Structure formats: C-alpha cells, structure tokens
C-alpha cells in the first residue's frame, strides 16, 4: 500500500512470504487475500469516509454490514471466512455506503472537554485487509509505537498492567465510524488517559522483537454478529488473559495503560521485565487508534525494518522520503515538517480547536499519508490524531507531559501541520471547496517550542509547492511549479490556518511579493508569490476562509454582521480591562505593603496579557472584515503599540518586530496553558453543549434524533438496568479521587436495531421539559448534572435568560401532581420526576422602613456572587423576626436594585451604606406564588436502583465564584456613620477578595467605573451570550432612558455624600490640627466649601426636575420624558458657569502630591490619615476623595450624551440636550485651560498676593475660579525703568473678580541665550517674569480715550487710582487689544467686576450674594431660558438675600407639580397643575409666562448661553433709552404710592433698578448706567401685587 509500516506488518505477521510485497501488491484499494483468517465484527452504525475534496454527512448513513447486506453480500460468517471479499468489486459495493465526516469549528471557544466519539474497527470483518492486520499484528504495531511497558492498576490488580503500541497508519483505516464506540471522551476520567507515542529510538529494537514474540500467545474471542460496541465496556477485556473484546487478538503487550502520565519522563529508559509483561491481559482495541505521526504513502519502503525504526524517531516523524534519501530529505531541510505534531503542539491544538460531542464533531488531522485511501481520490482525513491529542490534553500531570514532549531538538519541532477545522453540518460541503490554489515558495519562519517559547526555525530553506487552500487548511503538493495537480494527487503536507493572520512582508531583504502567515498555534511561515495581485489574492482568500470558519462556529450565516458584533464586544472588553489596569496602577502608587504590591503587579500583568489578546483578536477580526468587504487591512502599527514590555523584549530577542511575531507570541502564550486551565475547570455539561447544530438544539448534545419524536417504549424501554450497565465502565473514573479502584465488568452488548434506536448514546433516559410558552422538548440529564447545569443548558438552547427563570420538577404521587423546586446545586439526576418545567421568575418591589425602636432590624443577609463576569446579589438568609420577612423577602431571591441603584454597580461600601439607612427600597427577582391546588414537595422521591452519586457537582452556588457576604443586621446601623458600619462578614470576605484583586482595588474600580464608564455597556465584560443579548434587546428606549436618568441621580447623590464625607472626615479635623499650614490646606481643599454648597443645590434641582413626572417608572415612550429631559438639560445650562468653580479646585490639584508627601516624614500627619481610614481602604483615602470632583465634572457630558442618544433626533429635547452637552464640554475645556494657566502663572499670582502691603490685604486670593477673562494685550506706554524695547511688550492680562493682573514674561530667546552661554547659575536664578502688576477692583477705573478712532484701533485705558494712605501715585496703562472685538470683551469683563464692586457697596457685604435659584425648564426649545440671566458671569448681579430667599421659596412651589405638595398660599397655585393631555408648550407658557418673550425672535440661543451684557439689552428691547425715563417716573410714583393696588411688579422692580443705576453713575453718567443695568424682566420669579422691593 505504499506505507512502510504496513509492509512491515505483512512481514512480521505472515512471515517471509509477504516480506517482498511491493507497491503493486499493496495498492490503495482494499484488497483481501483468499486465505481464511480470523473474523472481525464490524461496528454497526454509520461509517465515516474521509475525503479531502468533499465532506458530506447523512443522518441515515448505513454501516458497512448494512451496505454489504443491501448489495447481496453476507456481512459476517460464523466460521470466520469471507470468501466473497476476494473480488475487487467489493470495494465498489462497500463504497456505496460510505459518507465522509463533517467538521465543526470550535476554535473560537476552545475546550479541553472534547467529546470525540471513536469507532471500534469499522472494517474488522475483513481479515486480509490492512485493517485486519492493524488488529492482528499487535506486536508489530506495538513495536514501533513505543516499546514501553507500564503498570496499570486502575481497574483491578491485573487489568492491563503493561502496554506498548506500535505506531501504524493504514490507508483504509481512515474509514471510521465516529460514534460507534458510543462513549464521550469528556465522560472518561481524562486524568489517566494518554499515550506513549512520545519518544522512540532505534536503540529499543529489541523491545520490538519481544513484542513480536508474544503475539501468538493471545486467544481470540468473537462477539456475535448482532452485537456492537455501544460503550467503553465493550472494549474492556475480561480478567481472563485469553479473552479479547470484539474478537480482537489478545496480546501480552496490548493492554491500554491509563496512567502512563506519571511514567512519561522515564519512558526513554524504562522497560518492564518480561515476566511482568506475560501476566498482562490484552486490550487490543487501542490499536485502532493510530499514531498521530504521519507518513508519506506516495512511496514505499524497500527496507521495512529501517522504515519503522527511523520514521518515528523523536517528536517529528520523518517521511519515508527522508529515510530513502530522495527529494523528501531536501524537504526536511526546508523547515516545513511533515504531517507530524509534538506533544506541545497537540496540547495547543486541543486548546485552540475544541470540539464538543455532536454527530459531526469527528476531528481529522490531515497528514502526508492521510490522502491514501481505498479509492485514491484525494487526501483522506483521519480522526486518529484527535484521540491522541485529547488523551494528552486530559492528563493531570501536564508538567511531566510537557517535559517529556519538549525534550527534543528544534529540528523535531513540528508546529507546521494542523487539522482542518470543524464545520457545521449545514456547511460541510464547503470544507473541500478549493478557495485558492497556485504555486508558492514556502519557508518555515517561527516555531512554537517548549515552555510557550517562540523561536526562529533553525532549518529554513525555500521550497516550491503547489498550494491549495481547502476550507481552513493549506495543502502542499509536490509539483514542477508550472502545472497544477490532478484529482489523484496526494498532499505532502498541510498547514492549519484557522484563526490565522496574514501580513505582507514588503521589507524582505531578498525577495519580492512575500507574505507571512501566523496561525493560532504560535507558528509562522513565509510564502512568496509571483506578483502583487497574487499576494493580495492569497491574503484575501485566507482571511475570508478564516472569517467563514468563525461564522460557522457561531452558527451564523451573516458573517459581516457577526464580525462587527465581535469587534464591538472586543472593544468593550478592551475598554474594561484598560480601566482595570489604570486603577491597578493608581492603587500601586499608594500601596506600601509588599504582598499587596505583588498581588497588584500580578493582576496588572494579567490585564496586560488580556489586553494583548483582545487587541490581537480585534486586529484579526478587522483583517477578516476588510477581506470580506474589499477594504484596506488595518494599520499594524496601532496593534504593535499595545505590546507590553515583556512582549517587546521577546520580539527583540527574536529580532522580528512584526504582527506575525506578535501573533505567534500571543498564541503560544494563550493557546497552551491559559486555555487548558480554563477549559479543564469547565463542567462536563457545559463543555458538551458548546458545538451543536441548530437542527439539534431542541435536543441534548449527546442525543441523536433519527426520526420523529420517540415513543415512550422506545425511549424508556431499556429501563434503568441498561443504564446502570452502560455506566459501569464509563463513569468509573469521573470521581475526583482518581485512585479509587472499581471492578470493570463487561456489560452485555445491546443488540443494534436501526429502526428503533432513536437515542444513540449510553442509554441515558431523556427527560421532557416544558418551556414558559408550554412548548415541550427533550433533554438528557446525566449523573452529576445539577439543577443549575440543566437550567443553563435549556435556557442557552432556547435563547432564554437563565437568571430570570428557575427550574421546577413535576412529580406524580398517588395520581396527584406535586411540584418541587430544587436548589441550584442539587443533583436532579437522582430524582424520579415526571417532567421538568422552566418557569419565569417575577419581579417585586419591596420597601422596608425601620422605626425608631432599636429592636427593628431588616433581618436578612446578602451574598454577592460573580457569575460569568456579572456580579449578582442574592438573599442569603432571612430571619423570621425581621422586617424583611414580614415584607415577603425570601432566601434565594436575587436583588436587582437597592434604592433605585443597579445591584451590579454596587461595591461593598455602597451596600454597607444602603443597609445602614433607615429605609430600604428593593427590587427583587423571586419565585412566583404557587397556583391554587398545587402542593410543594419537601422531600421528593429518589432513584433506588440507579448508580451511586459519582461526586459533587463542579459548580457550587456560593463557593465557586469570588464574592462577599454582607449582613444588614448591625445593631446600631442607623446611628453609626456609614464608614463605620462594616460588619465582620464584610471584613472576612474582603480578605478573600484580596487574594485575587484586593478589596481596595475592587472597591476603587467599581466606584471609578461608575464615574468613568462612557456608555451604557452591558454589565458583563465577557462575550455576551445569546440569552444576555436577548435580554438587552428587551429593554426599550424608554427603559434605557429611565435607567440613565436614575444613574444620573444616584451617582449625584453618592457624589454629594462623598463631598460631605471629605469635609467631615478630613477638612474640618485638619483645620483644628497644626501639622498643615493654611496655604497647604488651601492647596488640598481649595474652594471645597463652595463646591459642596453648589452641588447640594444642583442635586436638588435634578431631583425636582425628575419629580415633574410623578409616574416616571410607568412611562413607556421616550416622548413622555419631555418635561424631565428639558428640566435636566436646563439644569446644566443654567448652572454651566457655576461649574467653573471646579477650575480652581482642579488647578490646585496638581500640587496635592507635594503636600501629601509630607505624610512620609511627618508622623503626626501620617497617624491622622491612618486614623481617618482605619480599614486602610483605598476608596477611603484622602487622595481618593480628592480625585472625585475631577472625575465627576468629566462624567456629566457622558451622562448627557447617553440621554441625547436615546431621544428622537427630530425632537426638541434632542436639540436641548445637544446644547447642554456642548455647554458642559465648554466647561470642561475651560477647566483645562484654567489648569494650564495656573501651571504657568500660578506662582506669579501667589507672589502678587504675598507682596501686598498694609494691615488688610485688598485681594485675598486670585483663584482660578474667579478668573473671568485672560487675553494678550500690547503695552503702549511701558516705563523706561524696564529698559529699552525694540517693540512694545506684550502683556498677559487677567481679569479676576477681585483684581486685574498684568504680567510680562520674557520669550524663549533669552532662555536660549543664557543656556547657550553656559551661565547655568544665572539661569537658575533668572526670573522670566520681568513685570507683574495687580490692580485691585477697589482701585480700578476704565477711562474713555479722547481719540475718535480709539475704538477702531482697539485701544483702551486702565487706571490704577492713587492712594494717599499708601502713598501710591496714579498709574495709567494704555493697552491695545488684538482686535476691536477683543477690546470689547476685555472692557466688558472689567465693567462686570466694577458693577460687582458697586453692588457690594450697596449691599454693604463683603461676600458675593447667593446665586439665583433654579427654575425648571420645558416646552419650546430654550424658551424658558430667554428671560433668564446667563448665570455665573453675572452672579454678582443677584438681588439681596431677603429677595433671593423669597424667590427661592416661590420657585420651589413652582416646579412642584403635585398639588398636595404645593402650599395653599402659593400665589400661582392654579398654574401648578400640568395639563393632562401632555401639552407641554402650553403648560410651560403658563408656568413661565413666556408670552412677553414670544416676539423676540431675533434672540439667538448662543446669546442666551453667552456672557454678553448686550444680551440683556436685547431682552429689554431696542427702546431702552426711550423707555428709561418712563420707568424712572414709574419708580418715583411707586415710592410715593406704595400701598396702591394698581401698582404692578414691573414698576416696583424699577425702583430697585433706579438705585442700581444711581450707584452705577459713579464712573459715568446716566447713559453709561443704562448700559450696565443687566436685570432682566422675569415676571415668573415673583407674583404681581405681592413683591416688596424694599431692601
């Protein structure tokens, strides 16, 4: 047949007679000699025919015996003869019943628990075929395969004590049946399954001879022709050494060793004594699992002995061409190994390409000899490699395995070849489709070596092949390069390209049109094409094939849509991990404990690796998307920028800094250990249900439905006895204690009946279950499956959210239906239920309030559990005497919200604060009440004769995931401070959390994520599964809008609480201490007091705005939120300038580290900080509190943007929110600008304050929050004392509320001159600010220039008036602005602070008056703003305090819609009721009396938001001068006749204006006073006829 081993088998088994068989005697057809030999029972069922060109599958494929019977042949003969098979026509007849296998791609979600189902010798009934020899020549097979003996005692003291396997590959052995063996590999104890195919050497030839010597001692045993291998027990041997299952010949060396792993490091030198070997019972069926090493079948070996000894040496099985010193040896030098894999490669491949059990999950590895089959059409693909790598992956001693597998040289590393990916059954035909073919030059580039290292391939030589891309595999054919291949060509090599990245290599020094392919195994290859077009076509073809494989795995047809969704998920993951990493780095800077630092560093390292993996996957998917859309590939520079330092070091060691090397390093790192650890920890049930076909989703993964719904007799006819028998051999190793010994009894093999064998798997009894929509379906519950496992499986299959449903069992007891709700971790396999019900949970709102008595407690405890990356809150226990029990709270309920705050956004400190409050609002998801007449079982009936419990479930409800327990039963929780209510449960759980991320890190991240998260992302950082996406889709825009509004309010309340805590915990105590000066306190806290007052006021306006709609929770349409959105947006617009308070705080924040570093040297300061944070939580440190204002001010635009995105683009509120977003962005820009100014000129401002003389400083502070304007002006009259000027100097002019500052700063030329002359000492002392001058507001005047063109020339005159008491002369500054507009702005700012000065004198107060209170907005776009004062820049123009209080009271009554809440004395009570029909415009007009502004169509909204004083004039109209005299006259009348009822509020308000105008005339006449009057008519601030303007 062309295989050296096969010929050697003939030689050893049949004697010298067959030794000289050449290629013509062993063709690729299945030939049988006329000699009568042992009969083999062919496994019934479906037979898999491998074909690389086309791969299809039929659910009703007949087995080989069926095919024979249908074609008039007798399948089996009791006397063991098969005379009819002597004719070559047998091949054609048999081939009619063969169908190829399909593949299912699962590389995206790798799993170790692959359920590879193997056949038991499909063609054992053909004695003279090579399959027969495969079974018969046990010693020959063993001799090459390993020649090792190992003891085995897992299933008895004498069961399979030794094992040696000869590696053999047969042509027609490719004809497998993937499920005839009927056992799932994941159902086996994978701890003891491995192989000894690792290391072979020619020095062990005598072991081979011993093996041959033992061959004739075995006694065959046959099963009847009607039997089949339906479980692993079918393959188990009896204790009688002469008996072999299924008639296979017994061999002393044929025992299957299941605990080889412990002996693998010593395989090379370990040999058992022959005496021990002779007592070994045989287990011959392992011989049907051929070696993963492949051999070329295109050439035979003239010397079989040399062939079998050399071709299998080392991890790399060289082809026979290598041995025969032909063209093949040259190929060995090329670095492209044959169809071989090493241990590490198989481990990695198992991780990268998991497969769960399904009828199409047979995995095939394409090797150099796999193309040889009975028909010789093309490369057949065998499943043997699968079993081998699964055995290696499932071992528990992975370290020993890796050590043994990696003990070879670089030349033996075989990371070149991989298996074709699995595919969906519906897309099987595409597997063999040739996507691209052509002549390529190939060279090995990078090789994944042991210990997850990637190294340059040592044997690198360009080799020319004809390359064909079929599915996700590149097949290499030997060709002259000018012509293609025919259908009989055999691929020499194959490269697995699934999940690969292809990049052009234009920088190759010697060749053109080179591209590099790096796959998910950590290997890379170079290819050279003939042209640039061909290069691009190859890249597109490979990427397109990979994209199709991704879609095939996800069972999606729309590949583009899938890729875009995966890209979006990856971006969310990247964003999440970047925030986590930043928070970890921030925490690292403040942690001093070495253990904590190490934990944080380890976690940061994990995040870095995760980010690299996510970025690589993101780049890969973008490459696939670009290939499908015909676009340009993504820029690799951006990907390489994310490489961490260790990765860069590794790439530097390779000397290759490219996407290919980056991908290889990441794949080598994650493909072997990370995936293995993750997948080995998965439960068996979870791994089995990964890769299913959509047509089988209604069934369990391990069940195969051949025809309609089975009858009860068909499903349950076998009873529990058959189940018990089939489980005895399969589940004996599932128990975690692998050393437990159990007698293996060969069960009776069930007779196969294709007509009634509906469920073909281990005789598991399927269970009916009923979905919430009363739809029945079937599933299989296995031993060890918990209620949680079953619920998750069913919900995932039917796209349900498992957290919103629960599992209920129906029992029929005494003809009465009873129900039972199992615990999540309860094993339901043991329960004798009649039916499973999937029932939806209900959502309830519970409000609990404590009374003043100390005996009242909530009486429940919470557990926070992280499930699939989502943190959930569950009720752990409920006390019967507590308030929670009286309200109906039950243990096991899931808490969705606490006080309108989503549970997944709460950390431990927040939960503690909530539980300490006197009232608690809970939104819980609980079980509904039972229907009437239905009883609930307490102790359901269990199986009596079923198999014993095989171990605890791998999933535990509260122990398998990190979490913490919170108890709300603090005795004095209502009286103690929030920070002091942390209970003992919380502390102990914090220690648990610290082992992974540390409590401080979790708390800091949860809080910062709430502050920094820019979008309403899903709560899970992992990939969103189907049920989660379905749940997210169920949220309407109204629900999302409500959620964002609640988030805005809740985070604002939390922020205000944090600010108060900062003041109470740090600011006030520090003011009483002496270790910090007042200046240092100012640096730390700045204007914190003003910020707290403002935020309290702002929070109140937000709350009042939300209360505009009393039934906010019931709104179902977005347009119903109109009033609320206008109010919220108006709040930000109205207080936009007030937010500039933050500029001072943020500017001084840069100095905070310099002050806090004092704690390192000042023990008293350090002791104070420790005392204020006794639990040493990072979230409670002073630094953490001081950063919150900066985080919050940057959060506002993000929250507004979320509201903006959820509104209708054509609606008025959409525009309104857009303006609010832009305004808050301007505030953020202003804060950033102020911070830059402070960094540059802050020292000058401090020096000017310090240089003031006199007992009382005229200017107390130059705060950045008081800076109204900064600009550059030219000083036209500089004094001669400052030196000569080549041109007029430019001054930086700053207009503060308390002073005007002029500063001249030398340019960079002077600095360069000094540095260039090496006068460093002078440079250090040199002050760049040559001139600085401060003019307090009290001594400031603005004079009009006499020249007519002064305004046109943008010149103004600022005067620092003289002071006789200080002996200061008058000083005049002639300043030229950059433009007339700039001059206008400058003078406007100066006039505003002068007006503020006059107003303070009028009110005889030193402090600025309180700001005008908020009035809610609604209705027409910005109508309510048209009469409003633009806020902060004219905050100094507020009225008196008494007037402000009166207006605040009236405004409060105004925006309270609830009639019960409106005071009976409200002058506008009748206007408080909103219209029932939703006529917002009419209601707003009534509320705000907007009729007087309707005619002002020329007013721009930008004017409303600006600081223009001229806007005030536009509001008053164009006839201000004409109306002024009339208004003053009305004012005098109002003063004489104050008590008259005809006096209206407009005239009385003008009395106030008269006083202001009179005082404003100090610096000018009545004309200038009229310009500076800024009060705007707002009839809505006070009722007519009741406003008293007396001051």
From Swiss-Prot:
Phosphotyrosine-modified residues are where?
A: 829, 1323
What membrane topology is given?
Answer: Peripheral membrane protein
Lipidation (N-myristoyl glycine) occurs at 2
Name the reported effect of residue 1547 to E.
In NEDLDS; uncertain significance
Domain of life assignment: Eukaryota
Bias regions of kind Acidic residues — which residues? 977-990
Under PANTHER family, the record lists: RHO GUANINE NUCLEOTIDE EXCHANGE FACTOR TIAM1, TIAM (MAMMALIAN TUMOR INVASION AND METASTASIS FACTOR) HOMOLOG
Q: What is this protein called?
A: Rho guanine nucleotide exchange factor TIAM1
What organism is listed for this UniProt entry? Homo sapiens
Gene, per the UniProt record: TIAM1
């Amino acid at each position: 047949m062309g295989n050296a081993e096969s010929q050697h088998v003939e030689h050893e088994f049949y004697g010298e007679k067959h030794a000289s068989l050449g290629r013509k005697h062993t063709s690729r057809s299945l030939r049988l000699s006329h000699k009568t030999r042992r009969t083999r029972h062919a496994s019934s069922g479906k037979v898999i025919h491998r074909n690389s060109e086309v791969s299809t599958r039929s659910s009703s494929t007949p087995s080989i015996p069926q095919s024979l019977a249908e074609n008039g042949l007798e399948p089996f003969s009791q006397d063991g003869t098969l005379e009819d098979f002597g004719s070559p026509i047998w091949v054609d007849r048999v081939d009619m019943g063969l169908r190829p296998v399909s593949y299912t791609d699962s590389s995206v979600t790798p799993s170790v628990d692959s359920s590879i189902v193997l056949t038991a010798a499909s063609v054992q009934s053909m004695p003279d075929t090579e399959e027969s020899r495969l079974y018969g020549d046990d010693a020959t097979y063993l001799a090459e395969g390993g020649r090792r003996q190992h003891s085995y005692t897992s299933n008895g003291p004498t069961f399979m004590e030794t094992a040696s396997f000869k590696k053999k590959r047969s042509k027609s052995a490719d004809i497998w049946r993937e499920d005839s063996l009927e056992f799932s590999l994941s159902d086996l104890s994978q701890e003891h399954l491995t192989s000894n195919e690792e290391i072979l050497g020619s020095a062990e030839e005598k072991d081979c001879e011993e093996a041959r010597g033992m061959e004739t001692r075995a006694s065959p045993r046959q099963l009847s022709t009607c039997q089949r291998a339906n479980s692993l027990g079918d393959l188990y041997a009896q204790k009688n050494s002469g008996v072999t299952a299924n008639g296979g010949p017994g061999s002393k060396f044929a025992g299957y060793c299941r605990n080889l792993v412990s002996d693998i490091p010593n395989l090379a030198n370990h040999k058992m004594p022959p005496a021990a070997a002779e007592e070994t019972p045989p287990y011959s069926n392992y011989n049907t699992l051929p070696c993963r090493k492949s051999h070329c079948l295109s050439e035979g070996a003239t010397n079989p002995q040399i062939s079998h000894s050399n071709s299998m040496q080392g991890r790399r099985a060289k082809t026979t061409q290598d041995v025969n010193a032909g063209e093949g040896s040259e190929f060995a030098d090329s670095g492209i190994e044959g169809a071989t894999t090493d241990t590490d490669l198989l481990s990695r491949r198992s991780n990268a390409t998991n497969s769960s059990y399904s009828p199409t999950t047979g995995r095939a590895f394409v090797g150099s000899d796999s193309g040889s089959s009975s028909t010789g059409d093309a490369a057949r693909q065998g499943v043997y490699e699968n079993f081998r790598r699964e055995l290696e992956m499932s071992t528990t001693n992975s370290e020993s395995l890796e050590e043994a597998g990696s003990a070879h040289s670089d030349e033996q590393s075989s990371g070149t070849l991989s298996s074709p990916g699995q595919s969906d059954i519906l897309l099987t035909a595409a597997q063999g489709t040739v996507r691209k073919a052509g002549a390529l030059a190939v060279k090995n580039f990078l090789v994944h070596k042991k210990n997850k290292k990637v190294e340059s391939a040592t044997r690198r030589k360009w080799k020319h092949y004809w390359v064909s891309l079929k599915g996700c595999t590149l097949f290499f054919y030997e060709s002259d390069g000018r012509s293609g291949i025919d259908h009989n060509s055999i691929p020499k090599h194959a490269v697995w390209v699934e999940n690969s990245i292809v990049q052009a290599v234009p920088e190759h020094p010697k060749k053109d049109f080179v591209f590099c392919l790096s796959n998910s195994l950590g290997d890379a290859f170079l290819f050279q094409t003939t042209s640039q077009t061909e290069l691009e076509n190859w890249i597109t073809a490979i990427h397109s094939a990979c994209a199709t494989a991704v879609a095939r795995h996800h069972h999606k047809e729309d590949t583009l849509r899938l890729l875009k969704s995966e890209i979006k998920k990856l971006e969310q993951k990247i964003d999440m991990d970047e925030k986590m990493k930043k928070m970890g780095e921030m925490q690292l800077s403040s942690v001093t404990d070495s253990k904590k630092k190490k934990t944080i560093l380890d976690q940061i390292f994990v995040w870095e690796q995760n980010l690299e993996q996510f970025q690589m996957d993101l780049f890969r998917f973008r490459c696939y998307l670009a290939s499908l859309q015909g676009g340009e590939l993504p820029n690799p520079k951006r990907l390489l920028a994310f490489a961490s330092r260790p990765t860069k070091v590794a790439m530097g060691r390779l000397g290759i800094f490219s996407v290919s090397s980056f991908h290889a390093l990441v794949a080598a790192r994650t493909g072997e250990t990370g995936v293995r650890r993750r997948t080995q920890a998965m439960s068996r049930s979870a791994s089995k249900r990964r890769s299913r076909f959509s047509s089988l989703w209604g069934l369990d993964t391990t069940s195969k439905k051949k025809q309609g719904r089975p009858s009860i007799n068909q499903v349950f006819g076998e009873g529990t006895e058959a189940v018990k028998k089939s489980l005895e051999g399969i589940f004996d190793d599932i128990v975690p204690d692998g050393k437990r010994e159990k007698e293996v009894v060969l069960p009776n093999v069930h007779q196969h009946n294709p007509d009634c064998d509906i469920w073909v798997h281990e005789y598991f009894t399927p269970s009916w279950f009923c979905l919430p929509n009363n739809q029945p379906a079937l599933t299989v519950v296995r031993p060890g499956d918990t209620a949680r496992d079953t619920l998750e499986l069913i919900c995932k299959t039917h796209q349900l959210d498992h957290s919103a449903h629960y599992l209920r069992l129906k029992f029929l007891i005494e003809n009465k239906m009873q129900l039972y709700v199992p615990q999540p971790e309860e094993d339901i396999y043991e329960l004798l239920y009649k039916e499973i019900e999937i029932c939806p949970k209900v959502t309830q709102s519970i409000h609990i309030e404590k009374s003043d008595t100390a005996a009242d407690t909530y009486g429940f405890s919470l557990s926070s559990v992280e499930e699939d990356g989502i943190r959930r809150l569950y009720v752990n226990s409920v006390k019967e005497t507590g308030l929670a029990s009286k309200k109906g709270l039950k243990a096991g309920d899931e808490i969705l919200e606490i006080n309108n705050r989503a549970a997944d956004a709460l950390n431990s400190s927040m939960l503690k604060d909530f539980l300490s409050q006197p009232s608690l609002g809970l939104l819980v998801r609980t079980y509904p009440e039972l229907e009437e007449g239905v009883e609930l079982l307490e102790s359901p009936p269990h199986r009596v004769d079923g198999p014993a419990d095989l171990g605890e479930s791998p999933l535990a409800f509260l122990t398998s995931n990190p979490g913490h327990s919170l108890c709300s039963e603090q005795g004095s929780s209502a009286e103690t401070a929030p920070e002091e209510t942390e209970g003992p449960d919380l502390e102990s759980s914090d220690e648990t959390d610290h082992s992974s991320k540390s409590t401080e890190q979790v708390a800091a991240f949860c809080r910062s994520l709430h502050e920094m998260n820019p979008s309403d992302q899903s709560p899970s950082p992992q990939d969103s599964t189907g049920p989660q996406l379905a749940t997210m889709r169920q949220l309407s825009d109204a629900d999302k809008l409500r959620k964002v509004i609640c988030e805005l309010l809740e985070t604002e309340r939390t922020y205000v609480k944090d600010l108060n805590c900062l003041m109470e915990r740090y600011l006030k105590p520090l003011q009483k201490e002496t270790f910090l000066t007042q200046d240092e306190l100012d640096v730390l806290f700045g204007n914190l007091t003003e910020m707290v007052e403002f935020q309290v006021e702002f929070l109140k306006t937000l709350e009042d705005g939300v209360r505009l709609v009393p039934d906010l929770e019931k709104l179902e349409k977005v347009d119903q939120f109109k009033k609320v959105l206008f109010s919220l947006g108006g709040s930000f617009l109205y207080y936009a300038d007030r937010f500039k308070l933050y500029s001072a705080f943020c500017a001084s924040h840069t100095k905070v580290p310099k002050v806090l570093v004092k704690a390192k040297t000042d023990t008293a300061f350090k002791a104070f900080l420790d005392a204020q944070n006794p639990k040493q939580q990072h979230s409670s440190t002073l630094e953490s509190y001081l950063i919150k204002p900066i985080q919050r001010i940057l959060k506002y635009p993000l929250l507004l943007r979320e509201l903006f995105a959820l509104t209708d683009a054509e609606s008025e509120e959409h525009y309104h929110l857009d303006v609010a977003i832009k305004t808050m962005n301007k505030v953020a820009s202003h804060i950033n600008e102020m911070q830059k100014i402070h960094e540059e000129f802050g020292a000058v401002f401090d020096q000017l304050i310090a240089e003031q003389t006199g007992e009382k400083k005229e200017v107390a502070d130059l705060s950045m929050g008081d800076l109204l304007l900064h600009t550059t002006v030219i000083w036209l009259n500089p004094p001669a004392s400052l030196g000569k000027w080549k041109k007029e100097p430019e001054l930086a002019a700053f207009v503060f509320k308390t002073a005007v500052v002029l500063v001249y700063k030398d340019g960079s030329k002077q600095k360069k001159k000094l540095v260039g002359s090496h006068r460093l000492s002078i440079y250090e002392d040199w002050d760049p600010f040559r001139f600085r001058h401060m003019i307090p507001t009290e001594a400031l005047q603005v004079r009009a220039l006499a020249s007519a063109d002064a305004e046109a020339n943008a010149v103004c005159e600022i005067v620092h008036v003289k002071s006789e008491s200080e002996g200061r002369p008058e000083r005049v500054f002639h300043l030229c602005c950059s433009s007339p507009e700039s001059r206008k702005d400058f003078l406007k700012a100066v006039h505003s602070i002068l007006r503020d000065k006059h107003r303070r004198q009028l009110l005889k107060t030193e402090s600025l008056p309180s700001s005008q209170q908020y009035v809610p907005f609604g209705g027409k776009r910005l109508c309510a703003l048209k009469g409003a004062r633009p806020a902060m820049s004219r905050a100094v123009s507020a009225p008196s305090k008494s007037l402000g209080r009166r207006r605040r009271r009236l405004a409060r009554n105004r925006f309270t819609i609830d009639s019960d809440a409106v005071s009976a004395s409200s002058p506008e009570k009748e206007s408080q009721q909103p219209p029932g029909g939703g006529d917002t415009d009419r209601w707003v007009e009534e509320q705000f009396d907007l009729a007087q502004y309707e005619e002002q169509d020329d007013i721009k909204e930008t004017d409303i938001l600006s600081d223009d004083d001229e806007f005030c004039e536009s509001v008053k109209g164009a006839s201000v001068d004409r109306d002024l005299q009339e208004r003053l006259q009305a004012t005098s009348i109002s003063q004489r006749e104050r008590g008259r009822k005809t006096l209206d509020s407009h005239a009385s308000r003008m009395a106030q204006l008269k006083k202001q105008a009179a005082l404003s005339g100090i610096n000018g006449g009545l004309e200038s006073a009229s310009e500076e009057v800024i009060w705007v008519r707002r009839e809505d601030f006070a009722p007519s006829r009741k406003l008293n303007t007396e001051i």
